[in-house]
Swiss-Prot record:
Organism of origin: Arabidopsis thaliana (Mouse-ear cress)
Protein name stated in the entry: Stress-induced protein KIN2
Spans of repeat Sequence: 31-35, 49-53
Record carries keyword Cell cycle: no
Region span, Disordered: 1-20
GN (gene name): KIN2
Length: 66
């Protein structure tokens, strides 16, 4: 194998490894974003449920929930 071919091969290997690392990092970022989105959605649901419960409590105590 000539020196030029060897250098081209090694450059290709390095590029392939860099691409694989970037794909792994992108997958991790996607997973983290999905987890954050799910967590935010759950927090929003909890807040909404608490607000509805508070409204119903006030309605019950004031006699408006008939």
């Amino acid at each position: 194998m000539s020196e030029t071919n060897k250098n081209a091969f090694q450059a290709g290997q390095a590029a392939g490894k860099a691409e694989e690392k970037s794909n792994v990092l992108l997958d991790k970022a996607k997973d983290a974003a999905a987890a954050a989105g799910a967590s935010a959605q759950q927090a929003g649901k909890s807040i909404s449920d608490a607000a509805v419960g508070g409204v119903n409590f006030v309605k019950d105590k004031t006699g408006l929930n008939k």
